[in-house]
Amino acid sequence: MAGKRTERSMEERKMDRNNGGSKSKAPNGANAQTGATPMASPAVQAVAASGSSKGAPLFVAADPDLVAKKGVAQDSWFVISHLMSGSDRLDLLIHYIRLTPPQGDVIQAMVSVLDPVSGKSISEERDYKVSETTFSTASLDVQTPSGGLSGDASAMHVTGRFQRIDVDLMLAQQGPLLANLGTGLLPFYGDINYEYALPSMKTTGSIVVDGKAYQVAGVSWFDRQWGQMAPSFWAHMQWSWMGISLDNGDRISLWDIIDGDKEHAFATLLHPDGRHEIVDVEPLAKDATSIWKSAATGHRYPTHWVVSIPMLKARLRVEPLVREQEVVSPIGVNKYEGASKVAGQMEGKPVTGHAVVELVGDWN
């Protein structure tokens, strides 16, 4: 990116919507760190066959790439919901992922919700053996003992069955697909990942928190990521990710990846008309403050960020709705998943919105 602000044309964006979109950028479709060119999946080949011959190549497609992937080290389906039930606000995160940590393959089911009654975050993560779950490679059908996902982008059924939280939601795509870094390729700790988002999915259904039922409606950000992990991943992993939804309709997917002495901070801005802008971000660590220490794990996390994007003349203050939003992991991959509020300036205009901030790694 090297200080560039990249904007794709409306013609190319229309092609993206027709073909399911695109994401993440490495030069000429290659791994920016290794030079290897990723092998195209059947979904990618379908996009290439029917897509535009101009502009950046597309490596993801919304519906075809919902299915589970064979031969990858991680396969993730991530839902962030901003919901209302009457005057009650519920911020929900539900995540299903296949991982290959050093101790062997594991399936993680995770949920986190801000309880409208107590105002506190309730979260739970459960881990399963592969044999206890099913992941279809023919259609979206991810099932674990704690729930799963099925359907397609126009009618996605998301369920969760946890000790204190039950989730039953229907999601429907509205608006364009967000393609991180323009093609769908995300250089990630020396290897290649694929990633895209449907950041404005109409959402209805029910959530039960500690026995209290809520009929809910609102908007969800669905994020899909899969790919390989370099051998060094588990030793080096440390990142901040933000999914920012602004009230003006803009959506921002922001990564700040720390890999040893290297830090790569960048964002993809999606406008309501489908235009994408790829921009550099000032590293988040220097403006991250208000450290919170978890009583459960002893981990320390920043809980106040200033997002500075010079190319957009943007300065956004991001603060969690409550500080205590750690998700404790049975396999030790503890993380912070903070439902947050956003306010600031962009392109000379005031903006507000909401976000989720994910912190993974050692923040002590």
Where are the regions a protein language model picked out?
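Structured soluble/peripheral alpha/beta segments that form catalytic or ligand/cofactor-binding pockets
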Residues: 3-5, 11-18, 25, 29, ...
